[in-house]
């Protein structure tokens, strides 16, 4: 299975209304399409946001209503982090904020090596503060990392930074879906703000 995740893109006027993929010379992909099986597939079930983690999990045949936990568990699996009962795992991005606005979602295309220095530093500094005793940050790849909160409540409303470049970040902080999740949302938001102070 070859997934062109995010390849469809939007038509570009200067390319005659074609997308970049339509405009590109793609002899190898053309051959794969000609010799293979192609078709249309609805990869995002009703009620789920159209993220790659949703679509890819559905394509692999999983019932999302039964198994979907968000990106965190996938991030943990990808780096070999073994989650324990009661752990709440979240994808944690390093991003660039300037003048209170999200400049970019990838911390300026940070390398994994550079990110590892920052994530280790943040983990060491946050561990000194009792309020973050149940928080663990683990390095992933480039700007994508893992946040694990022991006893965290996953019923949260989070905004993906890549969806909101140029917007003020404060109104986009984590919000609870239910009041019981307020302590977890508050903890994550304090961690975000403390991380900015430290970095």
Write out the residue ranges for each language-model feature:
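Conserved structured core elements
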Residues: 1, 22-26, 189
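Beta-sheet entry/capping signal
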Residues: 1, 38, 144-146
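Beta-strand elements within well-structured catalytic alpha/beta cores of enzymes
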Residues: 1-10, 32, 191, 199
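Functionally constrained cores in energy, signaling, and assembly domains
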Residues: 4, 24, 195
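Active-site nucleophile/metal-coordination loop of metallo-enzymes that catalyze phosphate/sulfate
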Residues: 8-127
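A contiguous, mid-domain pocket- or channel-lining segment that forms the substrate-recognition surface
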Residues: 71-194, 198
């Amino acid at each position: 299975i070859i997934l062109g995740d995010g390849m469809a893109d939007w038509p570009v006027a200067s390319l005659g209304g074609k997308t970049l993929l339509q405009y590109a010379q793609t002899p190898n992909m053309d051959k794969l399409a000609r010799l293979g099986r192609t078709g249309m597939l609805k990869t995002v079930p009703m009620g789920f946001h159209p993220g790659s983690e949703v679509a890819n999990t559905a394509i692999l045949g999983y019932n999302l209503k039964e198994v979907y936990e968000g990106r965190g568990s996938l991030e943990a699996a990808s780096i070999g982090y073994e989650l324990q009962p009661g752990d709440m795992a979240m994808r944690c991005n390093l991003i660039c904020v300037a003048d209170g606005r999200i400049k970019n979602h990838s911390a300026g295309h940070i390398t994994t090596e550079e990110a590892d220095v920052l994530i280790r530093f943040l983990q060491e500094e946050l561990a000194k503060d009792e309020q973050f005793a149940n928080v663990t940050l683990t390095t992933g790849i480039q700007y994508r990392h893992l946040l694990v909160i022991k006893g965290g409540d996953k019923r949260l409303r989070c905004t993906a930074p890549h969806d909101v470049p140029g917007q003020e970040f404060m109104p986009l902080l984590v919000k609870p879906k239910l009041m019981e999740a307020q302590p977890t949302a508050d903890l994550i938001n304090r961690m975000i703000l403390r991380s900015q102070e430290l970095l």
